[in-house]
Regions:
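Glycine-rich ThDP/TPP pyrophosphate-binding loop and its adjacent helix/strand module
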Residues: 171-338, 342-347, 466-575
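Peripheral docking tails and interdomain loops at the edges
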Residues: 333-337, 445-447, 466-467, 591-604
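A glycine-rich helix N-cap at a beta->alpha junction
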Residues: 150-159, 225-237, 428-440
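Non-catalytic terminal/interface segments that mediate subunit docking, oligomerization
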Residues: 310-417, 422-432, 528-531
Length: 604
């Protein structure tokens, strides 16, 4: 018998008499789930916890022009010659908040003038304005009635760090992943055209290297064959999270440099215009007013500087993409002394690469945040940054595996789902030994629902030939990476969370293939922990009264597929109740896999 309790599954032996579970210690069936829930809530709150911020009155005095703009309608009443002052106040307001709250900094500093110009020229929210990637939407949010709420950026119950249709009518389309804006804006434009609406404007602001994604190319290809009222604003800062890779970037620089032969966009029947300075508000307004009245699909090429106006962010654009806490005056970052899971990945891949010349690391546009900088420094040719191209990355790795290389694909869990068909068709069905290192698995905190990595267990577990490992801490992650390097019998995935690693004490322990482990053999009520939930399980057990705690045994599953049948048989044979804890959705996850195993093996 199973009961759903948030993330966990709870199994209770059907023939267990009620008094057996309660016994002399009066053990409550709700005790373990309740203890878990308390710690889960505490963990979630810790993701959002931020220092107190100065009161709003201070900002009103500091930024009087910004605090006079409560909506784009207010913005449009201002004279053009005062808009640079508004831009300065807006930029400094973002710096004040993000230095304390944490968030995406460089991209937002780079689009301050562009956001002002767009809302000045277009009739938002009637005109649909879509911000690609979403992490460059802070100026847009502040100008559209959410200035005060920005004090609670990325807090639980506060303002999302990404556009959200549920949050504001000014957010025409929710964006957290990249390269979706042109498709969405084109869909809206086609719908309005079919309804006879020829006046509504549809604007897709795409930047931070998102234009080079396959989905953006597909949308451009379709858009060029239409006569829709669509404007694409290319925010070209020549960098994503890391420097842009790929041939398109050279073409874009040629266009900005005046080399306009073989213009890629014109060959697709898209009207092309550009400005010389994406931080010159009068120039931006003039260009936007011009393209606004042109027929058909248009593209305005806008060069900007990522981190504009904050010297540290301009000089170190990679670090200040998402800097964490930093000193508002000096720009100095407030680093954490503890090692991250991502650091472990980089260190161990470097160690393995020194012994295996067939090892290559692939990443879709995120080498630095994924921990690969250390490997790229020593072996630059063995770290392949494919750009924002998850589908291509997976099939590229499959092709490399066909030729005897050992590719490790390092990708965020939330972005891996963009390449699901490639995992199924190109890797799993062909049983190719591609190693998937699934970063940011589980709950990732204030980045919110677009970035939580809670689906990977459910969509990988059903796949044929797939092995899936969930290390509980830094030591197990190191062991799992070494296991993956030796495993050539098919695809293998390792999922691990964001941030500081738990228990990274050096160890010589290896991870036997397909085996979990028993950590507390004491009792007849079993907890099976999956991955990083082990620390939560231990804390939950510690909260129980002594007599109840003695009845709880604890298991670290480690290998989610294949399951350790020997371990599970021991668990279900000796236990009156079994609780599984995982940081993923309940349907189709590790708990349901354990439940299915129990049913198949006579433990209904």
């Amino acid at each position: 018998m199973y009961f759903a309790l948030g993330f966990p599954y709870l199994w209770i032996r059907q023939d267990a008499p009620r008094q057996t579970l309660r016994g002399k210690t009066s053990f409550s069936l709700a005790a373990l789930p309740s203890a878990f829930t308390i710690f889960a809530q505490t963990a979630c709150r810790s993701f959002f916890a931020t220092p107190a911020h100065p009161v709003e009155k201070t900002f009103r005095e500091k930024y009087p022009l910004l605090f006079s703009v409560n909506s784009p309608a207010d913005l449009r009443t201002l004279a053009v010659n005062v808009l640079p002052q508004l831009a300065e106040e807006l930029r400094n307001y973002i710096l004040d908040i993000v230095s304390v709250k944490q968030g995406h900094l460089g991209s937002n500093l780079g689009v301050v003038e562009l956001a002002i110009a767009l809302h000045y020229v277009f009739d938002t929210p009637h005109d649909a304005l879509i911000w690609d990637v979403g992490h460059q939407s802070y100026p847009h949010k502040i100008l559209t009635g959410r200035r005060d709420a920005f004090l609670h950026l990325r807090e639980q119950g506060g303002l999302s760090g990404f556009p959200s249709r549920a949050e504001s009518p000014y957010d025409a389309f929710g964006t957290g992943h990249s390269s979706t804006s042109i498709s969405a804006a084109l869909g809206m434009a086609l719908a309005d055209q079919l309804r006879g609406d020829s006046h509504t404007q549809h604007i897709a602001v795409i930047g931070d290297a998102s234009i080079a994604s396959g989905m953006a190319f597909e949308a451009l290809n379709h858009a060029g064959s239409t006569q829709t009222n669509l404007l694409i604003v290319l925010n070209d800062n020549a960098i994503g999270i890391d420097p842009v890779s790929g041939a398109l970037e050279k073409h874009l620089q040629d266009l900005l440099g005046g080399i306009d032969t073989d213009n890629f966009f014109r060959t697709l029947h898209i009207t092309y215009r550009q400005v010389s300075d994406g931080h010159n508000i009068p120039q931006l307004i003039a260009a936007l007013q011009q393209v606004k009245h042109l027929p058909g699909v248009k593209l305005l090429h806008v060069p900007t500087i990522k981190g504009k106006g904050f010297p540290s962010a301009e000089a170190e654009q990679i670090l200040y993409h998402y800097p964490g806490h930093f000193d508002r005056t000096t720009g100095l970052l407030k680093d954490s002394p503890r090692i991250r899971y991502q650091d472990i990945v980089g260190e161990e891949l470097l160690h393995l690469a020194r012994k295996d010349e067939t090892l290559y690391a692939l990443t879709p546009a995120m080498p630095t945040s994924s921990g690969l900088s250390i490997l790229r420094t020593e072996y630059p040719s063995r770290v392949i940054d494919t750009g924002i191209a998850e589908a291509h990355t997976l099939t590229l790795a499959a092709g490399m595996a066909c030729r005897g290389l050992r590719p490790f694909v390092v990708v965020y869990s939330t972005f891996l789902q963009r390449a699901y068909d490639q995992i199924v068709h190109d890797i799993a069905l062909q049983n190719l030994p591609v190693r998937l290192l699934i970063d940011r698995a589980g709950i990732v905190g204030p980045d919110g629902p677009t970035h939580h990595g809670v689906f990977d267990l459910s969509y990988l577990l059903p796949l044929p030939n797939m092995t899936l490992i969930a290390p509980a801490n830094g030591c197990e992650l190191r062991a799992a990476l070494h296991l993956a390097a030796r495993y050539d019998r098919g695809p293998i995935a390792i999922r691990y969370p964001r941030g500081e690693a738990q228990d990274d004490t050096p160890t010589e322990e290896t991870m036997p293939f397909g085996q979990g482990r028993c950590l507390r053999p004491e009792g007849d009520i079993a907890m099976i922990s999956v991955g990083a939930m082990l620390s939560v399980a231990r804390q939950a057990i510690a909260r129980l009264p002594d007599e109840q705690r003695q009845r709880v045994s604890l298991y670290d599953l480690r290998c989610v597929k294949p399951l350790d049948a020997s371990l599970l048989r021991e668990v279900f044979t000796r236990s009156q109740a079994v609780l599984t804890l995982e940081d993923g959705v309940r349907q189709g996850g590790a708990g349901s896999a354990v439940a299915l195993w129990a049913a198949d093996n006579g433990f209904p």
